């Protein structure tokens, strides 16, 4: 059907599906550098592709619509200035050195937390799909049942965790 696959990997830095890094599975992979992400520069993002035609188009769109082969004042496409600044690039380069190490640490911590709370009635964690060979653990997801805590609302439960120094917030 000639359908393009665009991966939303905004929160999946260093994650892998069946041993293949996310962002390299589809025609385009998109990642975010927003401040809350595992790899961050305050804002921004990047796109990955192995398709040279798409790479040229993306380059043009992020570079004011310029053509990679044309003069700097030629703008065959309508684009914007989405180029990464030097300061942001420096922040990201320094983080890339430890990306895999930090991903492994998040994975160990995610497993340890899951194991530690698995017997608490009213708290259920999601079981990662076995095809996820490297989990990004951008967030740790759990389901809360107020019934198991005498009707304590989710918001009060979150408030209590935070009061004890355990960072917690509601999902999307």
Residue ranges with predicted function:
Residues 1-32:
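Conserved PLP phosphate-binding loop immediately N-terminal to the Schiff-base lysine helix
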Residues 12, 35-38, 44, 107, ...:
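Hydrophobic alpha-helical segments, especially transmembrane helices
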Residues 13, 22, 39, 80, ...:
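Short clusters of hydrophobic/aromatic residues that line enzyme substrate/ligand-binding pockets
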Residues 16, 52-172:
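PLP-dependent aminotransferase class I/II
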Residues 19, 26, 43, 77-78:
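Alpha-helical hydrophobic/aromatic positions enriched in membrane-embedded helices and signal peptides
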